[in-house]
Amino acid sequence: MFIGYLLLILAIFGFYYSIQQINGSSIFKKKNLLDDWISKQNTISFNSILKNINPSGTPRGFVAASLSTSYPDYFYTWTRDAALVVRVLSDLPETDDDVLKDYIDFQIHIQNTPTVCHCLGEPKFNPDGTGYTGSWGRPQNDGPAERAITFIKIANRLKNSAYVSQKIVPALEKDLDYILQVWEQPCFDLWEEVDGVHFYTLMAMQRALLDAFDFFNLSKYRSTAYRIQEKIERFWSSEENYIRVTHEVREGANKPSGLDVSVLMAANMFATTREGFFTPGSDKVLATAAAIEKSFSSIYPINKNLQPDLGVAIGRYPEDVYDGYGSSKGNPWFLTTAAYVELYYLAMKEWKQTGLQINAVNKPFFERFLPIDDHCIYYSPDSQQLKEIINLVSLEADKFLATIQYHQQRNGSMSEQYSRYDGYMQGARDLTWSHAAFISAIKAREGNSVAF
């Protein structure tokens, strides 16, 4: 045990020393510069989101995925994107309540709009509020679950008002009833490419039902949530030491690795520390994070010979072929890179509360920057060793932020993707979800998670 602690101390000393030598200035100065950028970017991202809500010619409450109308055309609203964006806005005191109410009103409208799939899992709607009728991956059943989560967040913010009881509750119950009906059925994933049973979708559903139990105190929601959790457990692959993204694939993109950053996004957004179920700091999620990062570090040219203060650029999944315009080779995304920032900081928050055990499952996560032997080691919440580990992991988390800063435009714009070859932005301009993901990551960095 003593030798393990000694190695840890030596590793930490060497880590700090090497960074200072390579960068030629202290890490603290770099942190101050990063903090200054974060403060400015937070404001830019907030305003960018508002700019994409109710743009000219659209109904109030319409949340555009992007203002880009060609190459690519993202001037639509997705149930998922809108819910996840407004979920973040509802957590910010500077958000006007009218913005949230407009979102609710528009969502109630599209709940009752005729659609091709004749269900609440219709993913995409036109700028005039009508359903999109073109060929698409339908249904996408994470959408109603994410909307229910956001409805409950808004209801809790607005307290016991007539608006909550008369407007939000009936619409919320409609989404919850839908989840109870369809949770066992395959559907398309959040990337709209694979028809099957998905870790992300099930995590969204179980979180919506757990929140609903807290809100309504009805046992049917909790009992179904626990049944969903039993199904989610099966996504863990002990042979591969990571969580596979999809089971029971019926059609769609080929993902032989089974790796997908949406697994980590699900942990960030839908896990609860109270339940302790696939949380960001849990062994299996950390192991999955390590496997995904390792994969992207090898397949993206911009991840070769990285500057020491930059983190690995993260995409959706290794086999991705969507380049933001068409099919070729997939790229890193801003929102997926931000997911790593959020994951790391949420994990650190857990360790501060419960302590940390390094074991055979999560070893791949920690062995990248710590000397790890084959023994399980537990660090208590108040131990100096854990504090030093957290310092190391926070430096690694901030490298992902530095990557976002490095590849965005100087004016704070963030598109959907940035090139795997040269890092320049491509795809839909100022993707609303990119900006929301950044704000959510910074909330986690500040210790004020949107999720929990």
From Swiss-Prot:
The active site is at residues 189, 192. Coiled coil: none annotated. It comes from the Eukaryota. GO terms for biological process: polysaccharide catabolic process. One of its GO terms (molecular function) is glucan 1,4-alpha-glucosidase activity. It catalyses: Hydrolysis of terminal (1->4)-linked alpha-D-glucose residues successively from non-reducing ends of the chains with release of beta-D-glucose. Glycans are attached at residues 23, 217, 411. Residues 1-24 form the signal peptide. GO terms for cellular component: extracellular region; fungal-type vacuole. Keywords: Carbohydrate metabolism, Glycoprotein, Glycosidase, Hydrolase, Polysaccharide degradation, Secreted, Signal. Substrate binds at residue 136. Belongs to the glycosyl hydrolase 15 family. Consecutively hydrolyzes alpha(1-4) glycosidic bonds from the non-reducing ends of starch, resulting in the production of glucose. It also has a limited ability to produce glucose through the hydrolysis of amylopectin alpha(1-6) linkages. This is Glucoamylase amyD. It comes from Rhizopus delemar (strain RA 99-880 / ATCC MYA-4621 / FGSC 9543 / NRRL 43880).
